[in-house]
Amino acid sequence: MRKLARICIICVLALVVLALIPALINGNFQSEPDTTIPPEIDQNALIADASAYFERMCKGDFSTFHEALPSGIKSQTTPEDIKSAWGEEAHKMGVSPSLDTATVTLYRPEFSNQLRVEFSIPGEKGDFCFFINYTLEGSLYNYVVWVH
């Protein structure tokens, strides 16, 4: 029993250290992570940009979004890959993605140098979530189909 307790304590300490690594690397020792959106970012324009991509994908056009991705991301995926991941997750959640039913949120994730526009649509089996990430300067960075 004591050995199990020690292992649990070591695991918890390891998780704490892993959580602190980004702060140590960035020299950010604040107790709270920086989640502020830079004031020079036009939040409405960023949401409109992401929403236009999302709406096109809802209508089946994944090529336009793929072409806009940075070359490093674009070379790792295809429009068909994005469409496939999108379709699988939408089917699994029992939802037909639509901008009209999406809750759209712009935020800066903790310990991140990115801005995220999140599209969340409630489904029969959970929420379908699609993230479009931008750099802190407002350039398209990447995307994530949230897999449950």
Predicted ranges, named:
Residues 48, 63-112, 123:
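Short solvent-exposed beta->alpha transition segments
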Residues 1-14:
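N-terminal Sec-pathway targeting helices
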Residues 14-26:
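Hydrophobic alpha-helical membrane-insertion segments, chiefly the h-region
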Residues 9-12, 59, 130-131:
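Secreted/luminal cysteine- and crosslink-motif detector
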Residues 36-40, 51-55, 68-75, 118-120:
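Second-shell loop/turn segments in exported
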Residues 101-148:
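Exposed beta-sheet edge and beta->alpha loop/turn motif
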Residues 33, 58, 66-69, 132:
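Prokaryotic Sec-type signal peptides and long signal-anchor helices
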